[in-house]
Amino acid sequence: MKTSTIRRFIAAAAVAAMLTGCAAPARQSETSDVSTQSQQSQAAASSAPAQEMTFTDALGYTVQLSSWDRVASLYGSFAETWVLAGGSLVGATVDAVEERGMELGDGVALLGSVKEPNLEEIIAADPDFLILSADIAAQVDMHDALTSAGIPHAYYRVDGVSDYLAMLEQFCQMTGREDLYEENGLAVQAEVDRVLEAVQDEPHPTVLLLRAFSSGAKAKGDDNLAGVILRDLGAENLVEQHESLLEDVSLEEVIAADPDFIFVVTMGSSEEAALDYMEQNFESNPAWAELTAVQEDHYVLLPKELFHYKPNARWGESYAYLAKILYPELAAEIG
C-alpha cells in the first residue's frame, strides 16, 4: 500500500499539521515571469466599453474586432478570464465545466475539448469573437478554417501573472468593467507583490519540479507555471545546473544533487495513475527515501487548481502557497 505524508496549510491560522510517512509526496489539501518590476498595467481610462479594437495576438496575427456580443472560448482558463472581466459566453470547451467548475447555463454550447475542438459546433454557435490558446496545436491549426468561415478570433498565451493581467485588462476594456480589472487584476498583482517582498531577503533553496503523468515524469523549469513561481520566489531549480534532467530524469543525478525540495504536479485525467508511476519508478528505490527532501517532509504534491491550470484571480494564492512551503518561518507574515 502506498504511504503518504500530508501537510494541511491553513491560511487563517498559518499553521501546518503533519502526519508522518516516508516515501510518497506530501499531498496538499487546500485548494487555493513576475517580480516587483512585472507589468503594472493600468485599468482602462474610461468605463465605457470600447467600440472596436485592433491588436496583434500571441501568434502575430492582426486581429480586428467590431463587436464582441457573442464570445466563445476554446480554453477553460480563458473562458473564465472573459467572465472575470464581466463578459458572457455563447460557447466553451468541456474543460470549462470539468476542470474550472464553471456553470455555463443551458444556452452555452459545448464546443468539444481543448485538444479536439469541434469546428461544426463553433460555426453553429456563431461567435463574433473566438478566444483560442497559442499553445494547443489543434487550435493553432484551426486558423485558416476559422478565417474562411469568417469567425473573428485571437490567440493568447498565459505563462505568468503579467500575461494574465494583460489579457484581463484587454477584456475589461472590451466590457467597460474597469472595476473588475481592479478587483480581479490589480488586487491580484498586489497580493503577489506582497509575497515577493516578504521573501526577497531569504536564502535560495534548491528544488526539483516534476510533472508526472501515467507513463512518465519530466523535470520542468520556468517554462512551467509552477516553475515560474518557484523562480520568482528565489528557489534554485536543479534544471538550471543540470539541463539533462529536462530530457531524462536520472535518479542518480537527483540523488547526487540532493535538492532541498521536490515538487510534483500531475497532469492527465488520473492523478492516481501519475502517482503510481512515481511510486514504481522513483519511490521504490531505497535511495529515494534517503533524499533530504523526503527525509524532511519536503516532497510535495501541488494542487492542480493552483499549479497546473491557470489560477487567474488566484495567482496570489499560488504564490503564497509555495512561499509558505519554502519559507515556513514566514507563514504568519504571508498569511
Where in the sequence are the language-model features?
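Extracytoplasmic ligand-binding site segments that recognize negatively charged/polar headgroups
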Residues: 138-141, 157-170, 204-225
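Short helix-initiation/N-cap motifs at beta->coil->alpha
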Residues: 57-58, 109-119, 242-251
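Bacterial Sec-exported substrate-binding components of ABC uptake systems
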Residues: 2-9, 22-77, 179-208, 325-335
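Structured C-terminal subdomain patch of bacterial secreted/periplasmic proteins
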Residues: 165-166, 170-173, 179-182, 196, ...
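Proline-aspartate-enriched helix->loop->beta-strand connector
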Residues: 119-132, 151, 251-264
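Alpha-helical, coiled-coil/dimerization segments enriched in small aliphatic residues
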Residues: 96-98, 218-247
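A short, structured surface patch at a secondary-structure boundary
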Residues: 75-125, 129-135
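C-terminal motif of bacterial Sec signal peptides marking the signal peptidase cleavage site
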Residues: 17-21
